[in-house]
Every structure is written in C-alpha cells, then in structure tokens.
Amino acid sequence: MSFDTFYNIITGQPRSARETTSGVNPLDRSSLWPAPVATGNDVEEAVRSAQEAFPAWSEKTYKQRTELLEKFADLYLVHANEFCQLIATECGRTAGNAAIEVYVAAQWLRYPSKYEIPEEVTEDEKKTSIVTHEPLGVVAAICPWNFPLMLALGKIAPALATGNCVILKPSPFTPYSSLKLVELAQQVFPPSVLQVLHGHDDLGPMLVKHPRIQKITFTGSTTTGKQILRDAAETMKRVTLETAGNNASIILPDVNIEAVIPQLAGGLWFNAGQVCIATRRMYIHQDIFDEAVAQLAEASKDLASGMEPIQNEMQLVRLQQALSDANAAGCELLSLGKTEAAEGFFIQPTILKSPPPDADVVQQENFGPIVSCIKFSSLDEAISLANNSDTGLAASVWSSDVSAARRVAAKLEVGNVYINGPPQPDPYVPFGGHKQSGLGVEYGLPGLLSFCQTKSTYLYK
C-alpha cells in the first residue's frame, strides 16, 4: 500500500475527487500531498452503504467483531514505521514522539476484546426482565488534529466492537494518517463498515445533520461541540463530546520539589502542549512558589530547546495573541529560549509568573506551550481557584500525603484527576469532562456502552 497517495474510502473502495486540498508541514510550511474533498453526494453514498452494511455487521457476535479488531491491530503494527513517518510529517513531530502515538494507539484497537457487553436479568414473582445493549447504527466520528491516529482509533474501536458502522471525518489539518488507516482497514473489515471522508468545514455539519446517522462522537473545541449539540438536536442524535479543558495542577507544600518538577515539565511541554489534558494553570503553595517556578523554568529549558512546532497556523496565531495580551496586561513572562527553526509554526514555550487569577490568559484554554503559575496560601483557596473555570476536563494534585491529595481530588470539578503523576489517558478507564468540557464518556465499559442503545424486555409468567 502506497503512503504517498490519498483517497476517501467509500463502499470499501478508494475514491478520488475533482477538488483536493493540501496540508501544510508545520516544520517548514511546505505543502503536503493532495487529499480529496468529499462532496454531499459522497456523504449520501457513504451513509447509504453504511446502512446497508449494518445488518450483517451487527449480527456478528461481539467476539467475532473484537477478533477482527485484534487482527486489524496486528496489521496496523506491521505498517507502524510508515504511520510514524506520516504522523511526523503532518504533525511536525520528532520521530520519537510520533512513535509514541502510533504504538500507544494500538492499545485502543485491542481494549474492547477485554470486555463483554453485559446482559442483565432480574426476576420477581410476576416476570423476568432482561436488559440488553444493542448497536445504534451509523456513527460519525469527528476527530481533531493534535493526536489524529490515537483519537480516531479511540472512537473507531468501541463503535465497531459494539456493532455499529463508522464514518470517520479527520481534521482538515491532519487528514493523511486517517485516510491511510481506513484504507488499510479494508483488508480486514467488510465493505462500508468503516469509511472515511475528508473535506472542508461544511463536511462536519452535513454528517451531524444527516437524518440516517444515529450518533456523533466528537473531540475538539467547546465552541464546535456546542454547535454539534444544536445541529444534532433536530434529529435527537446520541452525542458524545470531549471538548476544551483549562486544566489545573495543585502543588502542595510537602512535595519533593526536585522529584516532582521534572514530571511536571515533561507533561507540560509534550507535543508542544497540544494535549487536551495538559496543565494550563499551575497553583503552587506560597511557601515553595519561587523555588518551584525557578526549578520548573530550569527543568524546562532542555525540553523547550527541542520543542516541536504548533500543528497549524491558526492555532499559532491564537497563542501569539494570548502572549501579546498577557504582555500588554503586565504579566511576567518567563521565556524558556528561542526555537531553532523559525520558518515553521514555532512559538517560544512560556511560563506566566503570578498573573492575576481572573486574567484572560488564565481563564482561557491556551492549547499550546503556555502555563500560568499562581501561588495559593490554603487548600480552600487552591480548590476555589482550580474550580474557577467553565470547563472541567482534568486536573492533577501533587503531595507526599496521598490521603490529603485524595481529599483535594474529591473536591475538584473535573472528570479526571491525576495524583502524583502526569496526565495520561487509559483505554480501560472511562474518560470524560465536567461542565463545558463535554458530555458522556469514552473508553472502558461505559465508553463501549455509549455506542449502544438499551432495550428492556419483560417476560411475564
């Protein structure tokens, strides 16, 4: 299979288009390969063929479907080197960081096979009640640009395992790995069970509004998530949303600073901060504040010098504006060194020291290598500051006293709390956000069941 020509995949076949777009290499702004732009007719054909494939696919047993996912995982890993090169190119990653995504993503293909979809039976004097979980039908998976493979597979695998057919829509900034992923999948799955469409900004709304698509699963911005909710309401679609998170870390005064700071730095700057659960706001106890910030800046310098670019120019401009606004507001900016290749979408990683907690740069999610460090004097203050956000995706707590850290975690208004370790998702653990960070959960058994509809059958005696 060639990894330098790209097609939409409809009805199991590669499909070119009259119109194409080309991505941009974030390292040097050079144009990448042409990718076909799907039309409204392509959407109709993909949905129709998915509907036709659904009965036979949904009638397979859960075990049969997960065995095919395992087979696909094996085939995918045979081509891991090609996917590593593709991710490195379209995302601007180092080879090592590209490999992290490619190999970790395979775990999401395998995790459904560790579960069974439950059937619950209860009985009383009058009847037996049976609760089953059935596939929905056609699912549209709308994916972002920061981890195009892993986040796509995190939606594809549970949807297919539970008997649905999937139409994948990658970000127009990073279509290439998704197009190749689905092309490769045709060697394993029946035609039209898994399709992919790349297109302009009108493609997502076409899928969301389509009356014969039963569910939308989306990862991306809160603004787009809200629009999806509005558009999906017309047909009462099931919706799972994972949206923005202005994530907080709380560092208690009893931590071993020398042990904790390198872990914090690694989590902050991985993938140039383009991680949905990365820390954006760091609340540090006043007794260790100056030392912790100084050590964080020092520990970050080596990481910052080799930092990758922002994936696209649109996001780069947003981050540049955030830093400009912070500077104009008088915030103290600790720049961690200049990046080497100025031609690409590079930005200096920056620590904001003691910005006002209500400043725009603190309250908005800066999806990139910018972190605000703010001191607190009491646990109640730290918890209040951390919860002072419209979003609630993730948080972390650092303390030598695990019991104290757990008490803090219990009061944080977020979907995911990481104690004494950097934020990392786990395919076996439900993942979702509170407040405006999303609806529903992905991963684990609850994530699998989110692709099902529940049926209760009553057998009267």
Swiss-Prot record:
The UniProt record lists the keyword Ribonucleoprotein: no
Transmembrane feature ranges: none
Active site as annotated: E242, C276
GTP-binding among keywords: no
Chain positions recorded as NAD(+) binding sites: G220, S221, T222, T223, T224, G225
InterPro entries, A to Z: Ald_DH/histidinol_DH, Ald_DH_C, Ald_DH_N, Aldehyde_DH_dom, LUC3-like
Listed PANTHER family: ALDEHYDE DEHYDROGENASE-RELATED (PTHR11699)
Protein family: Belongs to the aldehyde dehydrogenase family.
Protein name: Putative aldehyde dehydrogenase FUS7
Designated gene of the protein: FUS7
